[in-house]
């Protein structure tokens, strides 16, 4: 198949590889983007942490957590422009929706939109959205949300850069008085802050599927074979690389951003010892604003030409 410039550009953005390398990779795999990324990684030409993705759209991610910390939500609402995303009315609307989700616990977006709004039962959330669009003058979308409810623990959150990134974490604790303490809330916020910075894909290595692990091993094998190493040496090398892989993608095994002498698990264990309890991190969720959405881009040169009546 013919490889387009757009495909090459997308692969370059995803991997950081050179234009000719990207073109060759796409040709080798008949234009399959995911396979092209793997091809470049096997050749040592792409970073494992980079992923194909579209430019972010605008809007805001917000969190809401109950006063006692036993439940929390993360919500993303998109707008068309960054100008509106910084508007106080838009930000108030996002916070209202987050509070509603926390109170009413809808199962999905469809149920959320049909629910009577928690702040005014005479309106549905859909009506509230329509009114906000009319007042603010720009299209908006309630894109996604996630809800955590802690049994024998607490939920913590962290919002970065005014709503560009949001994280929700849940942990259990074997002492009720500690669960409701400010010190425990600080531990959760620290872990959430780390998650915002480090972008883990899984909580622990047990959560990594066999397929994902085998795919990584095959990439390591292919790269090692390029150096001419024998198979028995390759397998030993793979063992070390797999541990590094877990350290890159599993939250509990990542180097803790606020103390690089510890992993996140070691930070949690040290905090538990200090608080005189046992702490287990159960799950996390991370929203990056506009992740996976294609941003509407304008061609300034084309707009000028059109305005001048040129073609």
From Swiss-Prot:
Coiled coil: none annotated. Residues 81-84 are annotated as: Involved in Mg(2+) ion dislocation from EF-Tu. This is Elongation factor Ts. GO terms for molecular function: translation elongation factor activity. Belongs to the EF-Ts family. It is found in: Cytoplasm. Associates with the EF-Tu.GDP complex and induces the exchange of GDP to GTP. It remains bound to the aminoacyl-tRNA.EF-Tu.GTP complex up to the GTP hydrolysis stage on the ribosome. HAMAP family: EF_Ts. Keywords: Cytoplasm, Elongation factor, Protein biosynthesis.
